[in-house]
């Protein structure tokens, strides 16, 4: 087995491998950090590489913390019955991973989100690492593997559901029977997709 296969096997079931102990120690530190943190190198090198990361200029890796559970909506100021407040049981219709990608994109508006992956969770939070690319960097522009991201069509791609997590949330992994309301978009089908 090659190095990447060993890493992948260890991360398949973190609690049973050496990753579990490492994660416990890391999370103590991660909880005290800001929500969005730029990091030097990926925690899961195998996953990052398979999702398009390269150790070269123009690539940035960001760790994002997202609160678990449904959406906490702002409280109404006007009077009403507590049951009609509309505070609870309103999910954001997006995965936490997609939300993490959006947080990273807002923090670094000059970069585009390439992809992301899970790195840990506890009772309150989930952590994701987001691979970001600088579309204006000459190294990125001259690399035929990633130069597509410099095009106008990919500007703000995470906010339009064009990343892998976004496409999954929009139901675009399914086709055929049962997926009639998925394409061309959720909005075009008047929200019947979800």
Curated annotation (Swiss-Prot):
It holds the Pfam family Ribosomal_L15e. Keywords: Ribonucleoprotein, Ribosomal protein. SMART domains: Ribosomal_L15e. GO terms for cellular component: cytosolic large ribosomal subunit. Residues 167-176 have a biased composition (Basic residues). Residues 164-194 are annotated as: Disordered. InterPro entries: Rbsml_eL15_core_dom_sf (IPR024794), Ribosomal_eL15 (IPR000439), Ribosomal_eL15_arc (IPR020926), Ribosomal_eL15_CS (IPR020925), Ribosomal_uL23/eL15/eS24_sf (IPR012678). Disulfide bonds: none annotated. One of its GO terms (molecular function) is RNA binding. One of its GO terms (biological process) is cytoplasmic translation. Belongs to the eukaryotic ribosomal protein eL15 family. This is Large ribosomal subunit protein eL15. It comes from Thermococcus gammatolerans (strain DSM 15229 / JCM 11827 / EJ3).
